[in-house]
Amino acid sequence: MKAGVPWLLHLYQSWNDCVDRLILRSFAKVNIGLKILKRRPDGYHNIHTIFQEVDFHDNIYLALQDDGCSLAVDKSGIPKDGTNSCVVAYKMIKNHFPEIGGISIRMEKMIPHGSGLGGGSSNAATVLKGLNKMYNLGIENKILETISAEIGADVPFFIRGGTQVGDGVGNELGPAELVNGTYLLIIPDILINTKWAYGKIKNHLNCSDQRPNFASFLKEGNLSFKFIQNDFEKIVIPAYPEIGRIKDRLSDMGATFTSLSGSGSTVFGIFDEEADAKSAKSCFQSQHQTVLTLPTNLEI
Protein backbone atom coordinates (compact mmCIF):
# COMPACT_ATOMS: atom_id res chain seq x y z
CA MET A 1 0.00 0.00 0.00
CA LYS A 2 0.93 3.64 -0.39
CA ALA A 3 1.42 5.77 2.68
CA GLY A 4 -1.31 8.37 2.71
CA VAL A 5 -2.72 7.44 -0.71
CA PRO A 6 -4.36 3.98 -0.48
CA TRP A 7 -3.55 1.71 -3.40
CA LEU A 8 -6.76 -0.17 -2.71
CA LEU A 9 -9.89 1.97 -2.58
CA HIS A 10 -12.61 -0.63 -2.13
CA LEU A 11 -12.69 -4.39 -1.72
CA TYR A 12 -15.72 -6.67 -1.79
CA GLN A 13 -15.27 -10.20 -0.41
CA SER A 14 -17.34 -13.03 -1.86
CA TRP A 15 -18.45 -16.20 -0.21
CA ASN A 16 -15.75 -18.36 -1.85
CA ASP A 17 -12.73 -16.30 -0.67
CA CYS A 18 -12.21 -14.68 -4.05
CA VAL A 19 -12.70 -10.93 -4.30
CA ASP A 20 -15.65 -10.10 -6.58
CA ARG A 21 -14.83 -6.45 -7.27
CA LEU A 22 -11.98 -4.03 -6.76
CA ILE A 23 -11.60 -0.31 -7.35
CA LEU A 24 -7.92 0.54 -7.72
CA ARG A 25 -5.83 3.65 -8.22
CA SER A 26 -3.32 3.43 -11.06
CA PHE A 27 -0.62 6.01 -10.36
CA ALA A 28 1.53 8.06 -12.74
CA LYS A 29 5.30 8.47 -12.57
CA VAL A 30 7.87 11.05 -13.53
CA ASN A 31 11.51 10.49 -14.42
CA ILE A 32 13.98 12.49 -12.36
CA GLY A 33 16.86 12.33 -14.79
CA LEU A 34 17.08 9.92 -17.71
CA LYS A 35 20.43 8.89 -19.15
CA ILE A 36 20.42 6.92 -22.40
CA LEU A 37 23.28 4.42 -22.49
CA LYS A 38 24.57 2.14 -25.25
CA ARG A 39 22.28 0.15 -27.46
CA ARG A 40 21.91 -3.49 -26.47
CA PRO A 41 22.15 -6.54 -28.76
CA ASP A 42 18.35 -6.87 -28.56
CA GLY A 43 17.97 -3.39 -30.09
CA TYR A 44 16.91 -1.61 -26.91
CA HIS A 45 18.97 0.97 -25.03
CA ASN A 46 20.11 0.62 -21.45
CA ILE A 47 19.06 3.58 -19.34
CA HIS A 48 19.65 5.06 -15.91
CA THR A 49 16.84 6.99 -14.23
CA ILE A 50 15.01 7.74 -11.01
CA PHE A 51 11.36 6.72 -11.18
CA GLN A 52 9.18 8.76 -8.84
CA GLU A 53 5.55 7.76 -8.43
CA VAL A 54 3.11 10.63 -7.93
CA ASP A 55 -0.44 10.88 -6.61
CA PHE A 56 -2.04 11.49 -9.99
CA HIS A 57 -3.94 8.46 -11.11
CA ASP A 58 -6.47 6.66 -13.24
CA ASN A 59 -9.24 4.68 -11.56
CA ILE A 60 -9.63 1.04 -12.54
CA TYR A 61 -12.77 -0.94 -11.73
CA LEU A 62 -12.38 -4.72 -11.81
CA ALA A 63 -15.12 -7.34 -11.57
CA LEU A 64 -14.98 -11.10 -11.95
CA GLN A 65 -16.72 -12.69 -14.91
CA ASP A 66 -16.95 -16.25 -16.16
CA ASP A 67 -14.29 -16.07 -18.85
CA GLY A 68 -12.23 -13.74 -21.00
CA CYS A 69 -11.40 -10.08 -20.58
CA SER A 70 -13.82 -7.24 -21.37
CA LEU A 71 -12.60 -3.65 -21.37
CA ALA A 72 -14.37 -0.29 -21.29
CA VAL A 73 -12.55 3.06 -21.33
CA ASP A 74 -14.10 6.49 -20.83
CA LYS A 75 -11.72 8.27 -23.23
CA SER A 76 -11.35 8.03 -26.99
CA GLY A 77 -8.02 7.18 -28.56
CA ILE A 78 -7.27 4.37 -26.11
CA PRO A 79 -7.17 0.89 -27.70
CA LYS A 80 -9.86 -1.42 -26.37
CA ASP A 81 -8.69 -4.59 -28.11
CA GLY A 82 -6.02 -7.15 -27.33
CA THR A 83 -3.25 -4.58 -27.72
CA ASN A 84 -4.32 -2.69 -24.59
CA SER A 85 -1.83 -3.26 -21.78
CA CYS A 86 -4.62 -4.27 -19.38
CA VAL A 87 -5.80 -7.04 -21.71
CA VAL A 88 -2.19 -8.15 -22.20
CA ALA A 89 -1.81 -8.29 -18.40
CA TYR A 90 -4.87 -10.53 -18.08
CA LYS A 91 -3.62 -12.86 -20.81
CA MET A 92 -0.23 -13.05 -19.12
CA ILE A 93 -1.78 -14.17 -15.82
CA LYS A 94 -4.14 -16.54 -17.64
CA ASN A 95 -1.15 -18.21 -19.31
CA HIS A 96 0.44 -18.84 -15.93
CA PHE A 97 -2.84 -19.73 -14.18
CA PRO A 98 -5.16 -21.23 -16.83
CA GLU A 99 -7.69 -22.25 -14.18
CA ILE A 100 -8.74 -18.66 -13.40
CA GLY A 101 -11.92 -17.18 -14.83
CA GLY A 102 -12.36 -13.86 -16.55
CA ILE A 103 -12.22 -10.19 -15.67
CA SER A 104 -14.24 -7.10 -16.54
CA ILE A 105 -12.15 -3.91 -16.61
CA ARG A 106 -13.52 -0.38 -16.65
CA MET A 107 -11.06 2.51 -16.74
CA GLU A 108 -11.52 6.16 -15.84
CA LYS A 109 -8.52 7.74 -17.56
CA MET A 110 -6.90 10.84 -16.14
CA ILE A 111 -3.30 10.17 -17.26
CA PRO A 112 -3.07 11.20 -20.94
CA HIS A 113 -1.81 8.72 -23.50
CA GLY A 114 1.68 9.54 -24.77
CA SER A 115 2.45 12.00 -22.00
CA GLY A 116 5.56 10.31 -20.56
CA LEU A 117 3.76 9.57 -17.28
CA GLY A 118 3.59 5.80 -17.74
CA GLY A 119 -0.19 5.50 -17.80
CA GLY A 120 -0.39 2.33 -19.88
CA SER A 121 2.33 0.57 -17.90
CA SER A 122 0.73 1.61 -14.63
CA ASN A 123 -2.64 0.28 -15.80
CA ALA A 124 -1.08 -3.08 -16.67
CA ALA A 125 0.64 -3.33 -13.28
CA THR A 126 -2.59 -2.40 -11.50
CA VAL A 127 -4.51 -5.13 -13.31
CA LEU A 128 -1.79 -7.68 -12.47
CA LYS A 129 -1.98 -6.75 -8.79
CA GLY A 130 -5.76 -6.78 -8.93
CA LEU A 131 -5.93 -10.25 -10.48
CA ASN A 132 -3.46 -11.53 -7.90
CA LYS A 133 -5.75 -10.26 -5.16
CA MET A 134 -9.09 -11.18 -6.69
CA TYR A 135 -8.17 -14.75 -7.51
CA ASN A 136 -6.08 -15.19 -4.35
CA LEU A 137 -3.10 -16.35 -6.43
CA GLY A 138 -0.47 -15.56 -3.81
CA ILE A 139 2.12 -14.33 -6.32
CA GLU A 140 4.97 -12.56 -4.53
CA ASN A 141 5.79 -9.09 -5.83
CA LYS A 142 9.23 -10.19 -7.06
CA ILE A 143 7.62 -12.84 -9.26
CA LEU A 144 4.95 -10.38 -10.35
CA GLU A 145 7.70 -7.97 -11.41
CA THR A 146 9.29 -10.70 -13.54
CA ILE A 147 5.97 -11.49 -15.20
CA SER A 148 5.24 -7.80 -15.73
CA ALA A 149 8.56 -7.18 -17.52
CA GLU A 150 7.20 -9.21 -20.44
CA ILE A 151 4.54 -6.51 -20.91
CA GLY A 152 6.79 -3.45 -20.84
CA ALA A 153 10.10 -2.21 -19.48
CA ASP A 154 8.68 0.09 -16.81
CA VAL A 155 5.74 -2.10 -15.72
CA PRO A 156 7.88 -3.68 -12.93
CA PHE A 157 8.36 -0.21 -11.43
CA PHE A 158 4.61 0.16 -11.03
CA ILE A 159 4.44 -3.19 -9.25
CA ARG A 160 6.90 -1.82 -6.71
CA GLY A 161 6.05 1.91 -6.73
CA GLY A 162 7.49 4.68 -4.59
CA THR A 163 10.94 5.97 -5.56
CA GLN A 164 13.24 3.60 -7.44
CA VAL A 165 16.50 3.71 -9.37
CA GLY A 166 15.90 2.21 -12.80
CA ASP A 167 18.67 0.49 -14.76
CA GLY A 168 18.80 -1.98 -17.63
CA VAL A 169 15.88 -1.02 -19.86
CA GLY A 170 14.16 0.33 -16.76
CA ASN A 171 13.30 -3.07 -15.34
CA GLU A 172 16.25 -3.39 -12.93
CA LEU A 173 15.12 -1.58 -9.80
CA GLY A 174 16.65 -0.46 -6.53
CA PRO A 175 15.29 1.78 -3.76
CA ALA A 176 16.06 5.49 -3.66
CA GLU A 177 15.14 8.27 -1.28
CA LEU A 178 11.82 10.00 -1.77
CA VAL A 179 12.21 13.25 -3.70
CA ASN A 180 10.04 15.57 -1.61
CA GLY A 181 8.31 18.70 -2.81
CA THR A 182 5.15 19.82 -4.55
CA TYR A 183 5.08 18.59 -8.13
CA LEU A 184 3.46 20.63 -10.89
CA LEU A 185 2.81 18.67 -14.08
CA ILE A 186 2.31 20.63 -17.29
CA ILE A 187 0.84 18.42 -20.01
CA PRO A 188 0.79 20.17 -23.40
CA ASP A 189 -1.43 18.89 -26.18
CA ILE A 190 1.53 17.22 -27.88
CA LEU A 191 1.87 13.50 -28.56
CA ILE A 192 5.49 12.33 -28.72
CA ASN A 193 6.10 8.87 -30.11
CA THR A 194 8.62 6.97 -27.99
CA LYS A 195 9.91 5.00 -30.99
CA TRP A 196 10.54 8.28 -32.81
CA ALA A 197 12.43 9.63 -29.80
CA TYR A 198 14.69 6.58 -29.52
CA GLY A 199 15.21 6.59 -33.29
CA LYS A 200 16.45 10.17 -33.13
CA ILE A 201 18.55 9.76 -30.00
CA LYS A 202 21.24 7.69 -31.71
CA ASN A 203 22.01 10.59 -34.06
CA HIS A 204 22.20 13.24 -31.33
CA LEU A 205 23.99 11.61 -28.42
CA ASN A 206 27.30 9.98 -27.84
CA CYS A 207 25.82 7.02 -25.99
CA SER A 208 28.27 5.20 -23.75
CA ASP A 209 28.31 2.59 -21.01
CA GLN A 210 29.28 5.15 -18.38
CA ARG A 211 26.44 5.00 -15.88
CA PRO A 212 25.83 8.06 -13.69
CA ASN A 213 24.52 7.77 -10.14
CA PHE A 214 21.54 10.09 -9.90
CA ALA A 215 20.57 8.75 -6.48
CA SER A 216 23.79 10.09 -4.96
CA PHE A 217 22.67 13.64 -5.80
CA LEU A 218 19.29 13.16 -4.13
CA LYS A 219 20.35 12.01 -0.69
CA GLU A 220 18.89 13.94 2.21
CA GLY A 221 21.23 16.74 3.22
CA ASN A 222 23.03 16.60 -0.14
CA LEU A 223 20.21 17.46 -2.53
CA SER A 224 21.58 18.69 -5.83
CA PHE A 225 19.75 18.61 -9.15
CA LYS A 226 22.36 20.35 -11.29
CA PHE A 227 23.92 17.13 -12.59
CA ILE A 228 20.57 15.46 -13.31
CA GLN A 229 19.29 15.74 -16.87
CA ASN A 230 16.97 13.96 -19.27
CA ASP A 231 18.80 13.12 -22.50
CA PHE A 232 15.56 13.19 -24.50
CA GLU A 233 15.38 16.96 -24.02
CA LYS A 234 18.22 17.33 -26.54
CA ILE A 235 15.98 16.08 -29.34
CA VAL A 236 12.47 16.84 -28.07
CA ILE A 237 12.93 20.55 -27.30
CA PRO A 238 14.29 21.45 -30.78
CA ALA A 239 11.38 19.56 -32.36
CA TYR A 240 8.78 20.99 -29.96
CA PRO A 241 9.99 24.43 -28.76
CA GLU A 242 6.93 24.93 -26.53
CA ILE A 243 8.34 22.26 -24.21
CA GLY A 244 11.51 24.29 -23.75
CA ARG A 245 9.47 27.41 -23.06
CA ILE A 246 7.47 25.58 -20.38
CA LYS A 247 10.68 24.43 -18.71
CA ASP A 248 12.11 27.93 -18.68
CA ARG A 249 8.93 29.43 -17.24
CA LEU A 250 8.78 26.84 -14.46
CA SER A 251 12.35 27.68 -13.48
CA ASP A 252 11.56 31.40 -13.53
CA MET A 253 8.58 30.75 -11.24
CA GLY A 254 10.71 29.14 -8.55
CA ALA A 255 10.89 25.42 -9.34
CA THR A 256 14.04 23.87 -7.89
CA PHE A 257 14.05 21.25 -10.66
CA THR A 258 12.36 21.08 -14.05
CA SER A 259 12.44 18.27 -16.57
CA LEU A 260 10.74 16.40 -19.33
CA SER A 261 9.25 13.13 -18.04
CA GLY A 262 10.31 10.14 -20.11
CA SER A 263 10.34 11.16 -23.77
CA GLY A 264 7.52 13.64 -23.08
CA SER A 265 5.39 15.47 -23.55
CA THR A 266 4.84 16.22 -19.85
CA VAL A 267 7.13 18.80 -18.26
CA PHE A 268 7.20 18.94 -14.48
CA GLY A 269 8.61 21.23 -11.84
CA ILE A 270 9.41 20.40 -8.22
CA PHE A 271 8.72 23.26 -5.82
CA ASP A 272 9.88 23.60 -2.22
CA GLU A 273 6.85 25.74 -1.39
CA GLU A 274 3.30 24.67 -2.24
CA ALA A 275 2.25 28.32 -2.60
CA ASP A 276 4.81 28.84 -5.37
CA ALA A 277 3.57 25.74 -7.18
CA LYS A 278 -0.04 26.94 -6.95
CA SER A 279 0.96 30.35 -8.28
CA ALA A 280 2.76 28.73 -11.23
CA LYS A 281 -0.23 26.49 -11.91
CA SER A 282 -2.50 29.52 -12.23
CA CYS A 283 -0.20 30.90 -14.95
CA PHE A 284 -0.30 27.72 -17.06
CA GLN A 285 -3.81 26.35 -16.61
CA SER A 286 -5.46 28.48 -19.29
CA GLN A 287 -3.05 27.11 -21.92
CA HIS A 288 -2.27 23.53 -20.87
CA GLN A 289 -3.56 20.73 -18.71
CA THR A 290 -1.98 21.18 -15.29
CA VAL A 291 -1.82 18.86 -12.29
CA LEU A 292 -0.64 19.75 -8.81
CA THR A 293 0.41 16.60 -7.00
CA LEU A 294 2.73 15.02 -4.44
CA PRO A 295 5.20 12.13 -4.59
CA THR A 296 4.06 8.84 -3.13
CA ASN A 297 6.19 6.63 -0.97
CA LEU A 298 6.24 2.98 -0.04
CA GLU A 299 4.79 2.14 3.34
CA ILE A 300 7.56 0.98 5.67
What residues fall within each predicted segment?
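Contiguous, small/hydrophobic- and glycine-enriched helical/loop subdomains that border
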Residues: 124, 128-165
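ATP-binding N-lobe of GHMP and related small-molecule kinases
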Residues: 5-7, 15-115, 133-142, 169, ...
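Short, basic/glycine-rich phosphate-binding loops at helix/coil junctions
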Residues: 66-74, 79, 127, 149, ...
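Glycine/serine-rich anion-binding loops at beta->alpha junctions
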Residues: 79, 106-135, 153, 255-271
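Residue-level signal for inorganic ion chemistry
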Residues: 32, 60, 86, 120, ...
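Generic non-transmembrane alpha-helical segments
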Residues: 89-96, 143, 147-150, 235, ...
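Conserved, helical-rich catalytic subdomain that frames metal- and/or nucleotide-binding sites
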Residues: 71, 158-160, 164-257, 272-275, ...
